[in-house]
From Swiss-Prot:
PANTHER family: 54S RIBOSOMAL PROTEIN BL35M (PTHR33343), LARGE RIBOSOMAL SUBUNIT PROTEIN BL35M (PTHR33343:SF1). This is Large ribosomal subunit protein bL35. One of its GO terms (biological process) is translation. NCBIfam families: rpmI_bact (TIGR00001). HAMAP family: Ribosomal_bL35 (MF_00514). It holds the Pfam family Ribosomal_L35p.
Amino acid sequence: MPKMKTVRGAAKRFKVGKNKIKRGSAFRSHILTKKPSKRMRDLRGPHYVDGTNVSAVKKMLGV
């Protein structure tokens, strides 16, 4: 049986660590002037894939 191909869009969006899958943060790309500084601070930092989606993301990444 051949190897499963990685979903290339998922490979560009997610990074796999030891036990968690890191993802980018939404709401940080444009129209930033109207968003409060507190919200922008809270959007900084690492974000991880929710536990309910981990198996689907792993399947896309071939992990």
